[in-house]
Regions:
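Basic/polar N-terminal segments that are highly enriched at the extreme N-terminus
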Residues: 1-12
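Short coil/turn connectors at secondary-structure junctions
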Residues: 10-14, 75-79, 109-110, 132-136, ...
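Glycine-rich phosphate/diphosphate-binding loop of Rossmann-like nucleotide-binding domains
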Residues: 16-33, 38-42, 159-232
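Buried hydrophobic positions in well-ordered alpha/beta secondary-structure cores of metabolic enzymes
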Residues: 21-24, 78, 140, 182, ...
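N-terminal beta-loop-helix "entrance" segment that forms/cooperates
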Residues: 43-68, 236-238
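N-terminal glycine-rich phosphate/adenylate-binding segment common to multiple enzyme folds
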Residues: 58-165, 253
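Short glycine/threonine-rich loop-to-helix capping motif typified by GTGT followed
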Residues: 61-64, 204-213, 239-246
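Glycine-rich phosphate-binding loop
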Residues: 72-89, 223-257
Length: 257
């Protein structure tokens, strides 16, 4: 007796495609090809909509990175597939970034920047003696606050007394949700280990506060091991001992590094 094949219900997602600048324009066609192949394999339909703004070419023509109704245009999408932003020969980097990508992150509250680090079969590794399976960890970067703010200013500009102030902003809400995401991720993995990227020996107010927040969140995850490492030695150990890491939780700047 033949049994009917099970069919996977098709799902349709609307994807905003923004190639942006430079390498973004080069890699986006191949990125879409891979994404469409994966979608076909898993019974997903992607409805892609390409937007030519959020680029320095658009800025050169319009004096801004995006149209005024950019958020309305993107709000109906399920995801944003973004290439790259920046062309400093024509637009200062802080103008292009704050005029596009950072707006996406803040306006849509994209508070997790998840960065997988994994060595695949067939990919040469610059680290001696490493093989697939030896390197497999995540960096969980806070994506909406922290060191990347526009709070501050310049005083006495152009004089010998010139002062520059730029402030970092951390909230209990922002730190807790980042840390909980990291611990939940670690809970789903065999090593069950979270490393906090910190610098509490030199940044004497905000980083000890982050250490404390991690200790508090860790109380709800007794099966997870937590350790804290200063960002300078942490980056060195990523190269020297990459296999020791599982999930790394980091502020906006440290996660970017």
């Amino acid at each position: 007796m033949n049994t009917p094949e099970k069919t996977v219900p098709s799902r349709t997602y609307r994807i905003a495609v923004l190639p942006g600048d430079g390498i973004g324009k080069e890699v986006m066609p191949e990125g879409l090809r891979v994404t469409q192949a994966a979608a076909q394999r898993f019974g997903i339909t992607l409805e892609c909509h390409t937007f030519e703004w959020a680029s320095c070419d658009y800025y050169a023509e319009h004096g801004k990175m995006m149209p005024d109704d950019w958020k309305a245009q993107l709000s109906g999408m399920d995801a944003i597939f973004f290439g790259a932003v920046g062309w400093p020969a024509t637009v200062p980097d802080h103008v292009s970034l704050w005029g596009s990508l950072l707006k996406f992150r803040r306006e849509f509250d994209q508070y997790i920047n998840l960065r997988p680090v994994r060595l695949f079969e067939g990919v040469p590794c610059p680290l001696a003696g490493r093989k697939p399976g030896d390197i497999d960890y995540y960096v969980v970067r806070e994506n909406t606050e922290g060191e990347y703010t526009s709070l501050g200013g310049v005083m006495y500009e152009g004089t010998d007394r010139e002062i520059v102030i730029q402030e970092s902003v951390y909230s209990r809400h922002g730190a807790n949700r980042l840390l909980k995401f990291a611990f939940d991720l670690a809970q789903s993995r065999p090593k069950k280990h979270v490393t906090l990227a910190t610098k509490s020996n030199g940044i004497a107010i905000s980083m000890p506060w982050w250490d404390k927040r991690a200790d508090e969140v860790a109380k709800d995850y007794p099966e997870i091991t937590l350790d804290k490492q200063h960002i300078d030695i942490l980056t060195a150990r990523f190269v020297l001992q990459p296999g020791r890491f599982d999930v790394v939780a980091a502020t906006n700047l440290f996660g970017d590094i």
